[in-house]
């Protein structure tokens, strides 16, 4: 079992000035989710997701999102994707490895911790 989140309600990390760092989409294992209190589950869960996706928007800075990805990885994320629809790239961040950048992939398949998850991306580049 898993707990998956959109940006409306998800896992996050305490961040500067009382703010919460939260990705556009995330995944947390059921075991970790159930270890939280009801109060923690009712708002931004104070934990780092095992898998997350950030999507660059027109109002975002790529450098700031790349720094945010480094924060996620330093805090225990196992896999993270940074999707840049303007540059037509997806940067794959894995624990203990340098990011791998894919140019205009038709799809991307995740490994652990979400083995079997596949995202079709070809429509992003059209």
Question: Where would I find each of the regions flagged by the language model?
Answer:
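C-terminal interaction segment
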Residues: 2-3, 11-75, 79-126
């Amino acid at each position: 079992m898993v707990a998956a989140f959109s940006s409306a309600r998800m896992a996050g990390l305490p961040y500067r000035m009382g703010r919460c760092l939260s990705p556009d989409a995330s995944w947390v294992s059921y075991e970790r989710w159930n270890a939280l209190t009801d109060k923690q589950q009712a708002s931004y869960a104070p934990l780092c997701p095992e898998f997350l996706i950030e999507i660059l928007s027109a109002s975002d800075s790529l450098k700031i999102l790349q720094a945010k990805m480094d924060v996620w990885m330093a805090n225990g994320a196992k896999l993270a994707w940074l999707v840049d629809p303007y540059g037509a790239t997806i940067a794959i961040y894995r624990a203990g490895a340098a990011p791998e950048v894919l140019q205009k992939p038709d799809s991307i398949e995740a490994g652990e911790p979400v083995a079997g998850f596949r995202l079709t991306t070809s429509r992003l580049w059209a």
